[in-house]
Swiss-Prot record:
Family annotation (Pfam families): DEFB136
Protein name: Defensin beta 136
Task of the protein: Host defense peptide that exhibits antibacterial and antifungal activity. Exhibits antimicrobial activity against E.coli, S.aureus and C.albicans (in vitro). Has high lipopolysaccharide (LPS)-binding affinity, and may thereby be involved in immunoregulation through LPS neutralization.
Highest taxon in the source lineage: Eukaryota
InterPro entries per record: DEFB136/42 (IPR035307)
Disulfide linkage: C33-C60, C40-C54, C44-C61
């Protein structure tokens, strides 16, 4: 792979939203993570607590019930 293609791939990957996208993201349901009442993301969004790794790159995140930061509120829900 040449350098230009590697750089393009790198920029596309870092521009992906971690956790919640523009219109929300419910995460991925993996059995080992759902047994702990959590879901998998590419990084825990605000208002979620990191528990473990789901596979190699996904993070198992559980919704915080207490002490949620103000950023955890979904701006699209009124």
């Amino acid at each position: 792979m040449n350098l230009c293609l590697s750089a393009l791939l790198f920029f596309l990957v870092i521009l992906l939203p971690s956790g919640k996208g523009m219109f929300g993201n419910d995460g991925v349901k993996v059995r080992t993570c759902t047994s702990q009442k959590a879901v998998c993301f590419f990084g825990c969004p605000p208002g979620y607590r990191w528990i473990a790794f789901c596979h190699n790159i996904l993070s198992c995140c559980k919704n915080m019930t207490r002490f949620q930061p103000p950023q955890a509120k979904d701006p699209w829900v009124h």
